[in-house]
Amino acid sequence: MEKDNGRQFTISQENWSLHRKGFQDQRRHQEKVRDAIKKNLPDLVSEENIVMSNGKDVIKIPIRSLDEYKIRYNYDKNQHVGQGKGDSKIGDIVARDPNGDKQAGAGKGSGAGDQAGEDYNEAEVSIVELEEMLFSELALPNLQKKEEQELVVEDIAFNDIRKKGLMGNVDKRRTILAAIKRNALNGKANIMPIYNDDLRFKTWTETIRPESKAVVIAMMDTSGSMGRFEKYMARSFFFWMTRFLRTKYETVEIEFIAHHTEAKVVSEEDFFSKGESGGTICSSAYRKALELIDEKYNPRAYNIYPFHFSDGDNLTSDNARCLKLVNQLMDRSNLFGYGEVNQYSRHSTLMSAYKNITDPRFMHYILKEKGDVYHALKFFFQKSAEEAPV
C-alpha cells in the first residue's frame, strides 16, 4: 500500500482463471449431460413425451446415469478398520455390508421399505440435439444413382474475399491487415485510420451436387390385434424415420399406408394419430404399395424403400400372397424392411412365411421392448462403407 497526496493505493494480484470457474463447470456439466444422453439413446428415442411432442419444444427427460459427487455421512454406522495384517491380495474381500441384504431395490416388494431410492436428474434437451446424435449414425442403405437426377444446394461455403459486401460479413482480420499495409506504405506504423477501401468482406458460394431421388413407403398394421404397445412402437419407429429422412435428404418422398383387411394411402397426420380395428390381411398393404410404385415412382428414376411394421398376426391363408408380393416389391426396390413388434416371443404367422427368404434386400427386425426402436433404426439404416452421393 502506498500513499500519494493523501490518497491510498493498493496493489494486488489475483488468479483471473478463477473468474472462468463457473463457465468451466457449466461446460463440463453440459458435456456430462451430452455423454449421458448418448449412453441412454435407446431409452430416450422411445420416450413418450418426445414421440408425442411437436418436434420443436425443449423437453425434460430423466437421466439416471448422471452421477454427481457429494459428501455424505456413513449412515450404516459401522466400525471401520484402517490397517490390515499385511497379507491381503488384490481381489480379496475385506468386508461385507451387514445391512446389504436388507436393502430393497426398485422392484415390486411386499411392503414399504426404509431405504433411500435412486436419484436421477432431469435434463432439458431439444429434439434437434437428439437428432444430431441419432442421425449421425444413420443413412439410406444401398442408395444408387438413377437416370433422372435433380440439382439441389448442398451447402453454403464462405470461401472468397471481396471489397464490396454486407457489413455483417466484414472480415475484421483482413480489414485490419489491409489498413496496416496501406499505412506502412505511407510510412506510418499505425492501424488507424481505416478507410472504406480497406474493408474486406467474406462472400459465399453455393455448392451444388446431383442428388438421387428416393421414396420411402411406410406401411403399418392398424388391425385389432395391434395393441397399444404395438402401435406405439411402430409409430415411434416411423416418427424418427420420417424426421431422419427429412433432415438428411432433400429429395426423399414419403408415402404412408395404413391397413387392416384393406389398405389405403393416408395423410401423415392420420397415420400417426388415428387407430382402427378389424382383421389382418397384410397382402393388401403390399398390393397398395405396388400400385403406388407403378403409378408414381419408376424404379429407374427412384430408389425405393418399403417398410412394413406389424405384430405378425396375419391371416394364415394370406401368407402365400404376402410372400409373392414381397418378392415383387423387392424386384422394384433397393431394400424391403419388415419390423415385427413381438413383446412375448409368441408364434408369428407372418414371420414363419418370411424366415426362408434369402434375398439380401429383405431385412427384418423383431422388437420386444421400447429400447429396440433405436436398434431397429440402426439396423435398417446402417451406414455402408461407400455411400452413393445423396
UniProtKB/Swiss-Prot annotation:
Q: Which residues form the signal peptide?
A: none
Residue spans with biased composition (Basic and acidic residues)?
22-31, 86-100
Instruction: List the biased-composition ranges (Polar residues).
Output: 7-16
Q: Where is this region: Disordered?
A: 1-31, 81-118
In this UniProt entry, which cysteines form S-S bonds?
A: none
Q: Family, per the entry?
A: Belongs to the UPF0229 family.
Query: What's the protein name?
Result: UPF0229 protein ABC1477
